Design a protein with these regions (language model features):
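Interfacial loop-to-transmembrane junctions
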Residues: 191-212
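Cytoplasmic-side transmembrane-helix entry/capping segments in multi-pass membrane proteins
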Residues: 1-6, 31-32, 55-67, 202-209
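Juxtamembrane boundary at the C-terminal end of a transmembrane helix
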Residues: 216-225
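Hydrophobic alpha-helical segments and helix pairs
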Residues: 45-94
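A mid-sequence, solvent-exposed acidic-amphipathic segment
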Residues: 120-162
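Structural signature of hydrophobic alpha-helical transmembrane segments
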Residues: 26-39, 170-182
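Alpha-helical transmembrane segments
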Residues: 92-109
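A generic, lipid-embedded transmembrane alpha helix
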Residues: 4-20, 41, 68-72
Length: 225
């Protein structure tokens, strides 16, 4: 499965780079940015196969999302070309921001898996128990992913203030606001999990709320257009 996953990620990379990288610059349409984010997500999830048994359920969703994102990028038309090849600071900011989003998305899938396992355990209708990961392990990996994503989002916000001259401009300020709100939501969630042992619906609600705010912050202007 790992070898097949690597081949799939390579094909995803080739397809996305052909759509994203143009002779006059980089084509940052919503479909292409989404395909790039899903590429980072698929690559990370595939490498995680080597260490985490808990990744099997999320992996199915990740690969399905990757296939759909590539298909949409190939079908969708549009042009939003920018040339950032010589702006190392901006490349770093965009890269770390997309990777943080990918990790938050994977953490969200883990939250769904955690909720499902918790419900099955309570109802005592859990089949194939030997094939499923322990609930505590899934919970620990969920916390680890969210913490790593939060750290990257912090770096993304700081680098955005440094490298984006219009970070607080009127036409861009909504991105800073929604992304900062997402940061606060995730910070509260992490504190609740670490200090007060939150789990179940409360954690899932925080994870969903954070993803919604972050999606609006990252892609809101593209969606409006």
């Amino acid at each position: 499965v790992f070898s097949i996953g690597l081949v799939a990620v390579l094909c995803h990379f080739i397809s996305t780079s052909q759509e994203l990288l143009l002779s006059e610059g980089q084509n940052f349409t919503l479909a292409n940015v989404n395909a790039l984010m899903s590429l980072l997500l698929s690559a990370f999830a595939t490498l995680t196969l080597l260490k985490w048994r808990t990744i099997w359920f999320p992996l199915m969703i990740v690969y399905t999302f990757g296939i759909c994102s590539v298909a949409v990028s190939l079908i969708a038309t549009g042009n939003f070309t920018k040339n950032i090849a010589e702006n190392a600071g901006l490349i770093f900011h965009l890269g770390i921001a997309l990777f943080s989003y990918a990790l938050f998305f994977l953490a969200f899938i883990y939250a769904l898996q955690l909720k499902w396992l918790d419900q099955k355990l309570k109802s005592k209708k859990l089949f194939f128990c030997s094939m499923l990961p322990p609930l505590m392990t899934v919970e620990r990996h969920f916390f680890t992913l969210t913490l790593a994503a939060q750290a990257m989002l912090t770096v993304a916000l700081i680098s955005g203030m440094i490298y984006l001259h219009n970070f607080f401009a009127p036409e861009q300020v909504h991105k800073a606001i929604f992304t900062s709100l997402a940061w606060i939501i995730y910070a509260v969630q992490l504190l609740g999990q670490w200090k007060f042992r939150w789990r179940g619906n409360r954690v899932l609600i925080y994870s969903i709320s954070g993803m919604i705010l972050l999606t609006i912050g990252y892609f809101g202007s593209h969606l409006v257009k």
